[in-house]
Design a protein with these regions (language model features):
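Active-site/substrate-binding loop(s) of hydrolase catalytic cores
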Residues: 2-122
């Protein structure tokens, strides 16, 4: 679990790669993916599920990707909005994407974490 949403739902971060040597993992480039920024983007759940399934497959294509990259995946970035049946907004009726840094730091736990993670993996 990466953090909790404003309503206490888990915001998960999956890390998928191959290699038992931590130093080698830290040298790999990171590919960051997320889904359900806007709750109504239902198709993104199917896409991210397919990507995860593909990466966990034993095909030579997925093995090559995992050998060369670390995948960081947040399958559902706005779990509160999804649970409430919102189309675009979060728990408070606010736009979860593209908020100012001030707003993110003060009020939006999941977005603060998301933007911080993007900053860290640059």
């Amino acid at each position: 679990m990466l953090t909790k949403s404003l309503e206490g739902r888990s915001l998960d971060l999956l890390t998928i790669t191959v290699n038992s040597d931590r130093e080698k993992i830290e040298e790999k480039p990171v590919i960051f993916l997320s889904a359900r920024v806007h709750p109504g983007e239902v198709c993104s759940s199917f896409v991210i599920h397919g990507i995860i399934k593909f990466l966990l497959d034993s095909s030579p294509y997925s093995r090559k990707l995992l050998k060369n990259y670390v995948f960081k995946i947040i399958p559902m970035l706005n779990p509160d909005g999804v649970a409430r049946g919102h189309y675009r907004f979060d728990t408070r009726g606010m736009e979860p994407y593209g908020l100012t840094v001030h707003c993110v730091i003060i009020t939006c736990g999941q977005n603060k974490t998301y933007k911080f993670l993007l900053w860290v993996i640059k």
